[in-house]
């Protein structure tokens, strides 16, 4: 009986242990963990599947930033700010050394070695000042490397070149103001303001003149309605090919016929007709010369032609009448017959 109980207790213990193992396996499956029985095989399968290393985790370490001389470092308080703040100390040191050297030179003759020593002291002060500055700005580099890095930055950085140019221009302006070449800033601003006021006044006067001229042009075009004759008018109804009528001129034939001089009739001269057979005494015959109005008619003709040609600037009649005037002016009068010839003609006609 005792043996049976022992066997029953052992089997019960085995069942409980199996049940506990089953619960553990169930927990592993639900939690996503690998089965402890098949752990080695699962790891081997995972290594074969992850040949490219996509699922492996890599630990990344952050690199320390490399110290270098850049714009941020050079424009910081330890950079150019330190030089602008403390450069007057270096100037005072050099002035003090110069003053001591002048006092020594007044007492007696200065040797050449003393001059070199004075210059060496000044250069040593400058070198120590810049060594201290470089060490505070870039501690990891010695002075020689720091100078090399600063030269490279000055050649590459546009911001640093512009800043250096501004400093140089400011110093030049200060020297010019001290020497009286240029006026100070306040006087310069006042001069510029006065100049701007004058320029504005001149511009305003010019604008007023232009506006007045434009108004006059508008009024003149509205009243006239036409252009000045040099260009085609704005009116579309104008005839582009319209020509002015020709001026009234005197016909050349009429002018010539009006000034032709006819031979004087004997009856007009003697006062005796052809039918009168009365003997006329020579003493009773009174021959009066007839005035030939050649010049008067020609002058009247030229005056009329000139007055008519004045209306036409491109008239061709001027040449014709000028030549005609010259012809009749220079025409010689026919020689008058003497009294003796006239008497002979009268006697012949009477049959004597």
From Swiss-Prot:
GO MF: DNA binding
Residue runs in coiled coils: none
Keyword Cell cycle applies: yes
Function (record text): Forms a fork protection complex (FPC) with TOF1 and which is required for chromosome segregation during meiosis and DNA damage repair. FPC coordinates leading and lagging strand synthesis and moves with the replication fork. FPC stabilizes replication forks in a configuration that is recognized by replication checkpoint sensors.
Gene name of this polypeptide: CSM3
Keyword terms, alphabetized: Cell cycle, DNA damage, DNA repair, DNA replication inhibitor, Meiosis, Nucleus
Chief place of localization: nucleus
Name of the featured protein: Chromosome segregation in meiosis protein 3
Family per similarity comment: Belongs to the CSM3 family.
Composition skew (Basic and acidic residues), residue ranges: 16-37
Region (Disordered): 16-44, 330-352
UniProt entry tagged with the keyword DNA damage: yes
Source organism of this protein record: Scheffersomyces stipitis (strain ATCC 58785 / CBS 6054 / NBRC 10063 / NRRL Y-11545) (Yeast)
Superkingdom of the source species: Eukaryota
Subunit architecture: Component of the fork protection complex (FPC) consisting of TOF1 and CSM3.
GO cellular component labels: replication fork protection complex
Localization (cell): Nucleus
Gene Ontology biological process terms from the UniProt entry: DNA repair; DNA replication checkpoint signaling; meiotic cell cycle; replication fork arrest; replication fork processing
């Amino acid at each position: 009986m005792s043996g049976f109980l022992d066997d029953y207790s052992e089997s019960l213990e085995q069942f409980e242990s199996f049940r506990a193992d089953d619960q553990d396996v169930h927990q592993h499956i639900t939690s996503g963990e690998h089965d402890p029985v098949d752990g080695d095989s699962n790891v081997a399968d995972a290594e074969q599947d992850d040949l490219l290393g996509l699922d492996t985790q890599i630990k990344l370490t952050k690199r320390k930033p490399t110290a270098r001389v850049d714009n941020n470092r050079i424009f910081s308080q330890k950079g150019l700010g330190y030089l602008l703040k403390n450069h007057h100390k270096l100037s005072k040191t050099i002035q003090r050394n110069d003053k001591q050297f002048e006092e020594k030179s007044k007492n007696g003759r200065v040797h050449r070695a003393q001059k070199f020593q004075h210059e060496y002291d000044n250069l040593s002060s400058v070198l120590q000042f810049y060594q201290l500055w470089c060490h505070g700005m870039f501690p990891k580099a010695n002075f020689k490397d720091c100078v090399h890095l600063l030269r490279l930055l000055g050649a590459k950085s546009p911001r640093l070149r512009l800043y250096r140019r501004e400093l140089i221009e400011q110093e030049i302006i200060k020297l010019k103001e001290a020497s009286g070449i240029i006026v100070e800033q306040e006087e310069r601003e006042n001069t510029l303001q006065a100049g701007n006021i004058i320029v504005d006044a001149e511009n305003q006067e010019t604008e007023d003149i232009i506006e007045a001229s434009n108004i006059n042009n508008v009024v003149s075009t509205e009243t006239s309605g036409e252009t000045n004759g040099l260009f085609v008018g704005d009116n579309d109804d104008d005839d582009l090919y319209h020509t002015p009528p020709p001026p009234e001129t005197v016909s050349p034939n009429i002018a010539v016929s009006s000034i032709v001089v006819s031979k004087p009739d004997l009856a007009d001269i003697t006062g005796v007709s052809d039918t009168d057979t009365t003997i006329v005494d020579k003493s009773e015959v009174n021959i009066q010369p007839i005035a030939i109005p050649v010049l008067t008619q020609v002058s009247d003709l030229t005056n009329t032609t000139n007055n008519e040609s004045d209306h036409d600037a491109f008239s061709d009649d001027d040449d014709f009448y000028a030549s005609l005037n010259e012809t009749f002016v220079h025409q010689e009068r026919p020689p008058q017959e003497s009294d003796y010839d006239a008497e002979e003609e009268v006697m012949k006609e009477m049959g004597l």
